[in-house]
């Protein structure tokens, strides 16, 4: 499996994307996941934001990353597609990201729904809106060979029955699942059972632990975790993560495992990386 990490880890440290590339090089990590910004942004322009902007030249970015020995596992264009603004803001955002990803050598784009039931839409109306949006997105993504992943993060995607319908919105090998160990847990689901049901759809994985205090305060109330402040392996979700890795192994998954946690400039994500590497070795899972 391919170890990756989400640059959200360094939001609070006000790092740039290149700072994140340097961290990856220093820690022998060769894949990276980040958010995408559409249009100028002052934090990004000043170098205080560890993500990429779509006005940056993708071929130049690809070369810079190669100099660090790093490539994209996925870019994150996860503006919620489930609400009234999904078609007018989310769809153009994803469509703009597709050719950029192709030129930058990024094979996947993450998408998702909103955290809560959308206002002014019934569940069925929202599902109809999303189906049209994903059909439009996949029509373009297929031409570029870019995989569109549905990330488990919101009201619909953490509901297994709704997710099953979403994964069948479009009959395409380019529509897949970004499984998230932390968001399934915080939503009140069992991550292990959830993964067993959908393991055949998994195209990218977020590895995220949950602190005891967050679990006590928010489990079954929230559907997603913005940033986990718990090192992977030190929270109440660690045993579930280990079992999920076994399921992925036994089903032939060899794709990215993207670490998601608060980095605090390094210490938290460093500990997380060590735990994931050790656990993969203990489970006889080859790693890159």
Descriptions of predicted regions:
Residues 9, 48-52, 79-88, 230-235:
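The substrate-binding groove and active-site-proximal loops of carbohydrate-active enzymes
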Residues 46-50, 88-90, 124-126, 164-166, ...:
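Short low-complexity, flexible loop/linker segments enriched in glycine and/or proline
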Residues 33, 74-76, 110, 149, ...:
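Conserved beta-strand positions in the central sheet of alpha/beta enzyme cores
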Residues 9, 35-36, 76, 152:
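Residue-level recognition of beta-strand->loop/alpha-helix junctions
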Residues 37, 80, 114, 210, ...:
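Flexible loop residues that form catalytic
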Residues 19, 25, 58-60, 64-74, ...:
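Active-site acidic/histidine proton-transfer and metal-coordination neighborhood
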């Amino acid at each position: 499996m391919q170890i990756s990490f989400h640059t959200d880890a360094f939001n609070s440290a006000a790092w740039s994307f290149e700072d994140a590339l340097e961290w990856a090089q220093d820690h022998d990590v060769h894949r990276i996941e980040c958010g995408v910004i559409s249009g100028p942004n002052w934090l990004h322009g000043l170098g205080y934001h560890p993500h990429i902007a779509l006005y940056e030249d993708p071929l130049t970015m690809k070369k810079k990353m190669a100099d660090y020995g790093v490539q994209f596992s996925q870019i994150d264009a996860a503006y919620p597609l489930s609400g009234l603004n999904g078609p007018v803001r989310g769809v153009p955002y994803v469509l703009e990201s597709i050719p950029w990803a192709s030129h930058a050598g990024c094979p996947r784009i993450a998408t998702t729904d909103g955290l809560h039931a959308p206002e002014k839409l019934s569940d069925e109306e929202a599902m109809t809106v999303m189906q049209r949006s994903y059909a439009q997105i996949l029509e373009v993504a297929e031409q570029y060979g870019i995989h569109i992943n549905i990330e488990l993060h919101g009201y619909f995607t953490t509901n297994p029955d709704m997710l099953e319908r979403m994964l069948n919105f479009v009959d395409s090998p380019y529509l897949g699942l970004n499984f998230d160990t932390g968001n399934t847990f915080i939503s009140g689901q069992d991550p292990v059972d959830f993964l067993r049901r959908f393991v055949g759809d998994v195209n990218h994985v977020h590895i995220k632990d949950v602190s005891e205090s967050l679990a006590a305060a928010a489990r079954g109330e929230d559907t997603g975790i913005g940033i986990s402040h718990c090192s992977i392996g030190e929270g109440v979700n660690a045993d579930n993560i280990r079992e999920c890795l076994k399921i992925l192994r036994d089903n032939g998954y060899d794709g990215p495992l993207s670490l998601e946690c608060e980095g605090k400039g390094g210490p938290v994500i460093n500990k997380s990386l060590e735990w994931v590497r050790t656990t993969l070795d203990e489970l006889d899972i080859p790693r890159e």
